[in-house]
């Protein structure tokens, strides 16, 4: 359970877009932003923006401001204040302290080499050693082996992964993504998460965290991913090019086509607000590609 009470909002739709400031928004980021925006606005809901700046060594100076400027240039205006994870460490640490005190979490000093020798999954080696330093792991008492995706139906998580005591704070002192994102989504009242299919695997762990925190999990929708011409997922780690700030309408239309919209010819003459309004009105989950494979559509190097 939680060590303190979150201030929960009403159960009307609240979605979010949560980029990391490791570089500018690229075409793959635009797909995630648009998908989450259309899903929220088509249900007359709120669309929040959160900057997930948990990993300073990977961050690019000025990237957070550039991301927000890009969203504004594309007229993807968010509701409420932008939340920065770097300003919420107290929230994460309070929950970790609670779990350490209750015995639900423990310190671990196993190396990656040792875990590889265990078969690739951590086997709880340090659970009863009562260490006082190292990474912090959560005792997994509520493993999740499947969940329902709003477009793709039941998704399965490998049992070994679901049962693993995973890290909630790294040995270098940085907080783990899974813990931070769940605590933030609860705190912000998020009801549904729309994001790329590359985040399907951690979804099971995040749902486990909801249960262990005594909270009702959010709903999940995973979107198709864009690839570059070499067959790699468009990502900041793969040095994907930032999206063009001078022709946002054409980029929006390209991303909408990727998301399965049948774009009428007259929409190519519309302004940005008209395009987005049409997108909200015509957004349907069944238009999304069925395959969970990374798709090479629109991977011709334009983004």
Curated annotation (Swiss-Prot):
Keywords: Aminoacyl-tRNA synthetase, ATP-binding, Ligase, Metal-binding, Nucleotide-binding, Zinc. This is Glutamyl-Q tRNA(Asp) synthetase. A motif ('KMSKS' region) lies at residues 233-237. Belongs to the class-I aminoacyl-tRNA synthetase family. GluQ subfamily. It comes from Vibrio vulnificus (strain YJ016). HAMAP family: Glu_Q_tRNA_synth. The keyword Aminoacyl-tRNA synthetase applies. A motif ('HIGH' region) lies at residues 19-29. L-glutamate binds at residues 16-20, 52, 177, 195. Its cofactor is Zn(2+).
């Amino acid at each position: 359970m939680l060590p303190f009470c979150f201030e929960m909002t009403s159960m009307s739709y609240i979605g979010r877009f949560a980029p990391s400031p490791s570089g500018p928004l690229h075409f793959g980021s635009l797909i995630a932003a648009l998908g989450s925006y259309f899903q929220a606005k088509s249900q007359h809901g709120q669309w929040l923006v959160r900057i997930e700046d948990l990993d300073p060594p990977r961050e690019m100076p000025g990237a957070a401001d550039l991301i927000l400027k890009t969203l504004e240039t594309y007229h993807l205006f968010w509701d409420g204040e932008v939340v920065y994870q770097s300003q919420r460490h107290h929230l994460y640490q309070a929950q970790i302290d609670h779990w350490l005190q209750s015995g639900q979490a423990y310190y671990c000093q196993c190396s990656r080499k040792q875990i590889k020798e265990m078969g690739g999954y951590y086997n709880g080696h340090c659970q009863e050693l009562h260490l006082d330093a190292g990474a912090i792991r959560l005792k997994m008492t509520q493993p999740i082996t499947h969940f329902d995706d709003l477009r793709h139906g039941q998704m399965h998580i490998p049992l070994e992964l679901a049962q693993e005591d995973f890290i909630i704070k790294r040995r270098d002192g940085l907080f783990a993504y899974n813990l931070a994102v769940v605590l933030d989504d609860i705190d912000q009242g998020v009801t549904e998460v729309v994001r790329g299919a590359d985040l399907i695997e951690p979804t099971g762990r995040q749902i486990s965290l909801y249960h262990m925190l005594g909270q009702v999990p959010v709903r999940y929708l995973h979107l198709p991913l864009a690839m570059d011409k070499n067959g790699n997922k468009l990502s900041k780690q793969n040095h994907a090019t930032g999206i063009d700030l001078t022709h946002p309408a054409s980029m929006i239309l390209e991303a909408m086509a990727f998301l399965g919209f049948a774009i009428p010819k007259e929409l190519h003459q519309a302004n940005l607000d008209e395009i987005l309004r049409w997108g909200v009105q015509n957004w349907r989950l069944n238009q999304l590609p069925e395959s969970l494979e990374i798709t090479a559509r629109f991977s011709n190097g334009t983004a």
